[in-house]
Design a protein with these regions (language model features):
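Short secondary-structure boundary/capping segments
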Residues: 57-58, 161, 200-201, 277, ...
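Extended interfacial segments that mediate partner engagement and assembly in macromolecular machines
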Residues: 73-186
Length: 369
């Protein structure tokens, strides 16, 4: 969800955003209390943001509180919408749109266009059947000069290796299927699973192999997939631990799990506080810290847990957060102040060597053989 992170509403003008839907309350019988941390079960906690509202899509009513677990340091809403009513928060969600190929790097500037050509050449060398154009034939060599851009290119193909013949990939929470389409072009026997019926219809309309279903009860066969990816999904789940255990069950022995999610400990969260784009209440029910995510994966049975650099994503998060802080419309073309742009660039550089300091956490793990 990072490059072309989402097709946010009303793009273009920097006019004032609509007011959050606080006049209408979330149905009281549609809330549930959270007595313990959804990841580690800890009960000691502290309040981080007591009065959050939906300032992304402006469709979810209510005011929400985010707490931080004192044991694993993840964040979670309490109370939160019930599984039966959470759909109220997705009335205007971006996955309802028809699937489109992901835009990996901006081509709006001269530099962006040149980097996109290098990136295409780099990925074509990684995946011989990909055929991205325009592409520079020396992209695989020259991309070493642009490590943050190379890291973003790797993130956008989810750090996947060239597939063995017949390798099966499942993208869970695939939306309208953009990455399913990309994985097919990479050479995987790819399919998607999506809980949003409107998004499934959009994917099927695009001819993509996407079925309706959700974690943790997928109904799929055990030991079935070589790769499972979960991009910007775990933060939406009521039962994140059960979801990780289900993914472990679905993977073949030796199979790879790839996950991306906002980082509760991100510098942008420190900088912007309740305006940080990664919060997105009440759709984001849980926000993991590096410590919480590693512990949850270990407890679910995974091994070879490795955090990856998210690449040059910080400016996107900072710009989106700055829009929220300034009450601008979602997607508005608003300039990021120089000091914030500098902070974002430094964060991207730092995340190349220490991946857990980025706006996103990106991690790969394996099911032991």
């Amino acid at each position: 969800m990072v490059s072309n992170h989402e097709n946010e509403l009303n793009q273009g003008s920097a006019a004032e955003a609509p007011a959050p839907n606080t006049a209408q309350e979330w149905p009281e019988d549609g809330k549930e209390t959270v007595d313990a941390c959804p990841l580690c079960g800890g009960v000691e906690r502290s309040v981080v943001h007591p009065t959050l509202t939906d300032r992304i899509f402006f469709c979810a009513p209510g005011v929400w509180s985010l707490y931080r677990c004192k044991t694993c340091h993840c964040g979670y809403l309490d109370p939160r919408p019930t599984p039966q009513t959470i759909g109220l928060a997705y009335a205007e969600y971006y996955t309802h749109a028809a699937p489109q190929d992901e835009v990996f790097l901006s081509s709006a500037t001269f530099v962006g266009r040149r980097l996109a050509v290098l990136r295409n050449g780099y990925l074509n060398a990684r995946f011989p059947n990909l055929g991205l154009q325009p592409a520079h034939p020396l992209g695989s060599r020259l991309m070493g000069l642009f490590p943050a851009t190379r890291a973003l290119a790797e993130r956008d193909v989810r750090h996947l290796p060239t597939p063995e013949p017949g390798a099966r990939l499942l993208d869970i929470g695939c939306g309208s299927g953009a990455f399913v389409s990309r994985a097919l072009s990479l050479g995987y026997a790819a399919e998607g699973l999506e809980f949003d019926a409107k998004a499934v219809l959009a994917a099927l309309g695009g001819g993509l192999p996407v079925r309706h279903g959700a974690l943790p009860d997928t109904g799929l066969d055990s030991d079935s997939y070589d790769v499972i990816t979960l991009s910007q999904v775990i933060e939406h789940l009521h039962e994140p631990m059960a979801a990780l255990q289900e993914i472990f069950r679905l993977l073949k022995p030796g199979g790879v799990f790839w996950l991306a999610t906002p980082n509760m400990d991100a510098p942008g969260h420190v900088q912007f506080g309740p305006d940080w784009r990664g919060l997105e209440p009440p759709r984001h029910l849980v926000l993991v810290s590096p410590q919480a995510l590693a512990l949850a994966l270990e407890r679910s049975g995974f091994a070879q847990i490795e955090f990856k650099s998210p690449g040059a994503v910080s400016e996107w998060f900072h710009r989106a957060s700055y829009r929220i802080a300034n009450n601008a419309k979602p997607g508005a073309d608003i300039a990021l102040p120089k000091h914030l742009a500098k902070l974002a660039r430094r964060e991207d550089r730092d995340s190349l060597n220490k991946p857990v300091v980025g706006e996103e956490l990106v991690v790969m793990a394996r099911k032991p053989r």
